[in-house]
């Protein structure tokens, strides 16, 4: 019943595969200084993580709610999938042009910036450690790139790779081994890497998807305060 209550209150719902996708969207909105999108995503909204990229599952949930809340609107964001999405419906369905949302911050500079991050600690030991971490990360990246090439796979930075499974997981496994540490960043934490992508590196498609979210939110007549 909680979902019906949220649907009645908000009048719109956002579907993503997981909460990390939502966190990445929030990070990008902040970096772009897209105030309306930040206001919406930082507010109390109705988000429903589907746990998969199956459009029928999002549709079933949405239209089940819409039977009770007939003015409900929604937007669903999917990874690039081999499924036909529907257009012109109460549920706006969109997919990423790249394999998944993590591909939009997948680049060497982001990983090196992450490895070299000293946060607020800039003493000499931390700076030396940061350089060593960057060296370890570069070695990990090069080893994974070489392995992919040997296996006849895509280039490591290809938008057709599944960024999480094909690149980030093996890179962080090797990186952690080189540092003699347990895995330092796991799949449900990859969203943190988006912080290390500069504003000018954000793909125009991100703004397009944020525009679509803002449009749906603006068209709804829900309560933005509860």
Report the location of each language-model feature.
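C-terminal accessory helical subdomains adjacent to catalytic cores in phosphodiester-
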Residues: 84-226
């Amino acid at each position: 019943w909680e979902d019906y209550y949220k649907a009645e209150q908000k009048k719109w719902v956002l579907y993503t595969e997981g909460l990390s996708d939502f966190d990445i969207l929030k990070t990008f909105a902040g970096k772009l200084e897209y105030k309306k999108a930040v206001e919406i995503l930082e507010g109390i909204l109705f988000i429903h993580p589907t746990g998969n990229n199956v459009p029928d599952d999002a549709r079933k949930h949405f239209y089940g709610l819409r039977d009770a809340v007939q003015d409900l609107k929604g937007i669903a964001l999917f990874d690039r999938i081999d499924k036909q999405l529907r257009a012109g419906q109460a549920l706006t369905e969109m997919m990423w042009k790249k394999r998944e949302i993590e591909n939009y911050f997948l680049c060497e500079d982001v990983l090196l910036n992450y490895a070299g991050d000293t946060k607020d600690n800039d003493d000499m030991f931390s700076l030396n450690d940061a350089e060593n971490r960057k060296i370890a990360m570069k070695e990990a990246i090069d080893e994974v790139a070489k392995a992919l090439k040997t296996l006849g796979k895509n280039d490591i930075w290809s938008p057709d790779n599944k960024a999480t499974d094909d690149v980030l997981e093996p890179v962080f496994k090797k990186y952690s081994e080189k540092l003699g540490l347990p895995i330092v960043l796991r799949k449900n934490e990859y969203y943190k890497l988006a912080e290390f992508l500069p504003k000018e590196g954000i793909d125009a498609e991100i703004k397009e998807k944020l525009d679509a979210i803002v449009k749906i939110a603006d068209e709804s007549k829900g309560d933005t305060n509860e």
